[in-house]
Amino acid sequence: MAEKILFYIYRDSGTSSENLVRAIVDEFKNFVFRDRGIAFTSKGYSGIPLLGELPIDSPLDDIWKVVAVLFKISAREEGLIFKVHTTDYEKNPLVAEAKKSDVLPNWAHSVKDFAENVFGMNGVIHLISPTVSEKFPKRSQIDILRAVPNETRNILVTESLSEKLHSSESRNFGMHNTSVNVPVSMAYVARERPDILSLAIREFVKTDERKIKELEKRLANEHDRVMIHTIINDTDWKEVTAVADIESPTDIVSHRVSLALLAFDEKHSSIPNGVDVPVSGLFQKVGDRFEREHLEALRAKLFGSPQSATHLYQCAKSLVTGNHVQECRKIFVDEGSTSNRESDCSGNEDDSSNAKYAKKQVFKKKKRNAFGKKRELAAILDHTKPSEHSEPDYVAPDNSAALKKFERAVNGDDYYKASSDEYSLGEEEDLELFMAKPRKKILEEMKNKNKARLGIKVTERLPTVSDDEEIDVADMLRAAPPIANAEDIEDFDDI
């Protein structure tokens, strides 16, 4: 028996089995496994735990997509716990990533100790240490996690997985977004059913050259084509982008996808299909029958009842309506076109009595006030006689004074002739006119003027002298030369 990775999912009473199945199917509907994929089975009378089995040799993208989906569901569904188990503990993805980041706890003396006590709950990693286990010797590991979640959660190990989880949680992880030009009869199936598109590409890889030549002739007669946006699995993307000798190498993806769809349609449309597959009823609230069939087929595949490629394709093709085809055309159809307006969407399973009223509401002309205030556009210019724009003349700045100062500084002419008007800097100006006088002095001058006008004698006050400006007579005497005696002078000319 081939070794597998086992995923044990434990739900509490707050999460029903139906809600869990719907959540799993919804997360995997836009993902195509590279290999066989995961298969879930219910264990026990109440379906607890739900066991998922994935081949251990599966690509890493498949493994981490499953782990990321379980983390996401555990964060959304309260009380949901999951465990990843492998016979070889080194191949456990949680153990391998924690060991790579060197975040194994000190109490985990071996990889086995860590692998048997690591769980996922509430979107984070939980570890049951020996200290916590000793507090509840008679309880199971699941009961311990629900009893003391604050003591078991481990952010350090969760952070070591964050990079892998964030990339795996993205909508198009492991898939390629692309645009292809395909025949309109199979356009909607290729757009909305990546699983069927993947089956068609993988069967086309095994087609011989003679059959490919026939398909190319048939494709040349398919004049009604449409451009669609779809997603292709990484493995299938490598097949449709491989180098080939065709006329339009830039459109190699559209060419090969179209050939694959034609071959798939030719093979599986001719096979009689009388298989009656029971409906689970889990997706009755989904209005579109095409989408509901997609979810039912994916549920059957994930939970151990995969359907044949013939059944998948014939059911999907039979549920494509004119409205679905119109959705594929709407990128290139003019807004005023009335083609295919009378077709009903597959979501209207009952009477379509309100179809005309709904179309009238959609396509009726809107009033002017519905578009807001009328905009005023700018006047249209006559470009036949363009006006000549005259550029202003460049005026050189007058910096002669600055140059003269610079020349004087360079030549050493740092003195100025006060008598010359050319070199005068205003030394002879009365600077007192520009000096601010104290208020007390201004009032005193005004009083003196009034007294002089009245004929009163004004006593002039000596200006106050500061300590620095005072004259010391002793200093003056010390600075004067000594008086010479008459007897010391032999010749008066010596003086």
From Swiss-Prot:
InterPro entries linked to this entry: Ecd (IPR010770)
Cellular component GO terms, alphabetical: nucleus
Pfam short name (any one): SGT1
Region annotated Disordered, chain positions: 337-360
Domain of life: Eukaryota
UniProt protein name: Uncharacterized protein F19C6.2
Species of provenance: Caenorhabditis elegans
